[in-house]
Swiss-Prot record:
Gene name in the database record: groES
Any one Gene Ontology BP term: chaperone cofactor-dependent protein refolding
Record's protein name: Co-chaperonin GroES
Keyword line: Chaperone, Cytoplasm
GO molecular function: ATP binding; metal ion binding; protein folding chaperone; protein-folding chaperone binding; unfolded protein binding
Species for this entry: Leuconostoc mesenteroides subsp. mesenteroides (strain ATCC 8293 / DSM 20343 / BCRC 11652 / CCM 1803 / JCM 6124 / NCDO 523 / NBRC 100496 / NCIMB 8023 / NCTC 12954 / NRRL B-1118 / 37Y)
Xref: NCBIfam families: PRK00364.2-2 (NF001531), PRK00364.2-4 (NF001533), PRK00364.2-5 (NF001534)
Family: Belongs to the GroES chaperonin family.
Length: 94
């Protein structure tokens, strides 16, 4: 499994819908980039100026919303993930 460093998290991205609620099939270029996903791994936290570490707000298993163009796409063992900084996460879905 991937183990992110510092304030980074690994997200399993939720796929964009293939069709609308009304049943219209979307072309591949018409689908928005997904902005939701599940945290599958989290780093140790932020290192502050005094050397202490502040824990991350998100944890493994959280469903999150993130900035549309945030992070870096990563493939590991045939699975695609998104690696991003916690600051790029907008909200946790409860």
């Amino acid at each position: 499994m991937l183990k992110p460093l510092g304030d980074r998290v690994i997200i399993e991205v939720t796929e964009a819908a293939e069709e609308t609620v009304g049943g219209i099939v979307l072309a591949s270029n018409a689908k928005d980039k997904p902005v939701t996903g599940k945290v599958v791994a989290a780093g140790t936290g932020y290192v502050l100026n005094d050397g202490t570490v502040r824990d991350l707000t998100v944890k493994v298993g959280d469903e999150v919303l993130f900035d549309k163009y945030a992070g870096q796409e990563v493939s590991f063992e045939g699975q695609d993930y998104l690696a991003l900084h916690e600051k790029d996460i907008v909200a946790v879905v409860e």
